[in-house]
Amino acid sequence: MAGMLKIDGIERTVPAAETIKRVATTAESLGVTRLADITGLDRIGIPVYSSVVPKSGDSLSVYNGKGARPVDAQAGALMEAIERQTALKARPPHIEASFSELSKSANALDPKSINQKLSDDYSDDRTYSWIEGTDLVTGELWWIPAKLAGYLWHDVPHPSCFEINDTNGLASGNCRQEAICHALCELAERDTWTFAELGAHHLPRQRRSLVYGHRAKDGPDDLDMFPCVDVGPNQLLDKFHAVDLFPVIRDLTSELQVPTIFASVADEHITNFPMAHSGMGAHPDVNVALRRALSELAQSRCVDIQGVREDILPPNASPEFFSLHTRRISAVDRSSWYLGRSENTRRLEDIPSHKFDSLESDIDFLVTRFRACGLDRIIVVDLTPDETMYSVVRVIVPGIELWATDHGRLGPRALAFWKKHA
């Protein structure tokens, strides 16, 4: 279909240099004081940049970007800072009502349809704040719990329906379609990651517990459930190989059928350095998913070496359940699906892939795949300030699985998967 055409190779509607030019003044007004090149902290050479917001109201003050070129990494770092700071400061009009009351007269999103842990004191009859969102498919208006759609809105009246406030589905772009596409890809990645973690790690433990009881934690993951990928010639992968690093690359693509690539590497050459890192990418085009996974893998190493990002935890930390994925790994376990290699392999070109010319076509594909899995409601909350040359949205999909990032709550699809394979 016709629409917002993409620039080949970066999946954006304008060149990265133009993005930087558009948002430079906004970034400064939102508190960005520095854009730092941290590529040289590591030996790989894939560009990674950090944008710094010293007086951030966020839990983070350093944001990161990566890419095949320095200009792409610069744009990514600025846009991540703008995305989070815009979401922090946005205050769309809200109403105050209970779910029971509001759902009688309007489309109100049931908090229980979201696969996150509800607050201990949640009640359908308790008053909460709500803001408007739009169903991406039907165009209908929906009322969404404000603190689900927003980010760290502590001053908005009434408590949150949920235990935590995350950034899943929060995305920015040069235009609304670009932001929505980024958000949908992120949600597809989170969903797919959940099924991979359950299938390759937790199900083998469950099976062993039937035989060995309390010793269920001992033993390998299922390394063959998700095949390793034979990538073939690839410039980003060559940068790893040139410094004696050989990433494990897996195809995690699930029932969503959105190509999802996971890349990890263990570095045992440097002492006193966190040994294992990973990256992931999901996109209709498997080559874009691979590029995102490899560049994120490089970024995770640089950010770890930089040592200033507040959400990176030491290996011996006892994190909250929602921050387990940010804890460093201090030992290489080749029996884990994250780092172990599989005898089950497939070629990159054999993974079903969908390369479209427009963002609208990407979005149509993603929406079709979500709906094929019973994820029929896709709601967009626009957090974009007036008269800006960028867009920030929160996309909310009831039923999407987020457990891999927060270990909060398994939804019906994940539970059905567990029962089928246990």
What residue ranges belong to the model's regions?
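Helix-biased "structured C-terminal domain" signature
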Residues: 1-422
